[in-house]
UniProtKB/Swiss-Prot annotation:
It comes from Salmonella paratyphi B (strain ATCC BAA-1250 / SPB7). It comes from the Bacteria. Homotetramer. Forms heterodimers with either ThiH or ThiS. Its EC number is 2.8.1.10. Coiled coil: none annotated. The keyword Transferase applies. One of its GO terms (molecular function) is thiazole synthase activity. Gene3D superfamilies: Aldolase class I. InterPro entries: Aldolase_TIM, Thiazole_synthase_ThiG, ThiG. It holds the Pfam family ThiG. Belongs to the ThiG family. It catalyses: [ThiS sulfur-carrier protein]-C-terminal-Gly-aminoethanethioate + 2-iminoacetate + 1-deoxy-D-xylulose 5-phosphate = [ThiS sulfur-carrier protein]-C-terminal Gly-Gly + 2-[(2R,5Z)-2-carboxy-4-methylthiazol-5(2H)-ylidene]ethyl phosphate + 2 H2O + H(+). This is Thiazole synthase. CDD domains: ThiG.
Length: 256
């Protein structure tokens, strides 16, 4: 069970809504993933239409919506988008994204911290997408963010946990949930993140661009479940030396 702010989730897999070939395929994949928290970009939703092709099927599916501020380049733009989302969707939950460079889509740490502090004061449940910077993540926690979402690699790159060393520090020091976001390309990446101690992962591109998104969503669901179980089982410690699993001493003595 995962708790963030006032909500609890059975699934440790969060999903996105971008890049799917159709809204029907998007919903089928989300259902197959078992995800209960789904993020959507406000810039892609027509808030004037109750039957919006993205929003309507998500509401019907009964998932918790996590609007994001993707496309915002400054704290001011992100705050404005957040206020629109709260008014339109009736939720104070927000994935805070500020990336001024459209090529790399890396989060702006200064603007993110500035916006996070302001939004928390306005009553938002803020989940900030940020670099894998332990100092920044701690500052975001201190200003009241309900979770932190450090990247594993650049958005949509499918490179995996390129920031593993920093993620381990963030996980070790954090007192709020850590959700590894961006760069996760295959189910084994997700399992590794959960084994490391991350509380959840957010996956979009890896599922949406697969030849079979529904099958890939199922694979991610199983991988995340495996990662959680592996962590709970407490793996054995690493060793620089070999340790025989079947000692031969007694057997050889019996033959002597």
């Amino acid at each position: 069970m995962l708790r963030i702010a006032d909500k609890t989730f059975d699934s440790h897999l969060f999903t996105g809504t971008g890049k799917f070939a159709s809204s029907q395929l998007m919903v089928e994949a989300i259902r197959a993933s078992g995800s209960q928290l789904v993020t959507l970009a406000m810039k892609r939703v027509d808030l004037r239409q109750h039957n919006d092709a993205i929003l309507a099927p998500l509401i019907e599916a009964g998932v918790t919506l996590l609007p994001n501020t993707s496309g915002a380049k400054t704290a001011e733009e992100a705050i404005f988008a957040a206020q629109l989302a709260r008014e339109a969707l009736g939720t104070n939950w927000l994935k805070l994204e500020i990336h001024p460079d459209a090529r790399w889509l890396l989060p702006d740490p200064i603007e993110t911290l500035k916006a996070a502090e302001a939004l928390v004061k306005q009553g938002f449940v803020v989940l900030p997408y940020c670099g894998a910077d332990p100092v920044l993540c701690k500052r975001l926690e201190e200003v009241g963010c309900s979770a932190v979402m450090p990247l594993g690699a650049p958005i949509g790159s499918n490179q995996g946990l390129e920031t593993k060393a920093m993620l381990e520090i963030i996980i070790q020091q954090s007192t709020v949930p850590v959700v590894v976001d961006a760069g996760i390309g295959v189910p084994s990446h997700a399992a590794q993140a959960l084994e490391m101690g991350a509380d959840a992962v957010l996956v979009n591109t890896a599922i949406a661009v697969a030849d079979d998104p529904v099958m890939m969503a199922t694979a991610f669901r199983l991988a995340v479940e495996a990662g959680v179980l592996a962590r709970q089982a407490v793996p054995g410690s690493k060793s620089s030396q070999a340790s025989a699993t079947s000692p031969l001493t007694g057997f050889l003595e019996a033959l002597a």
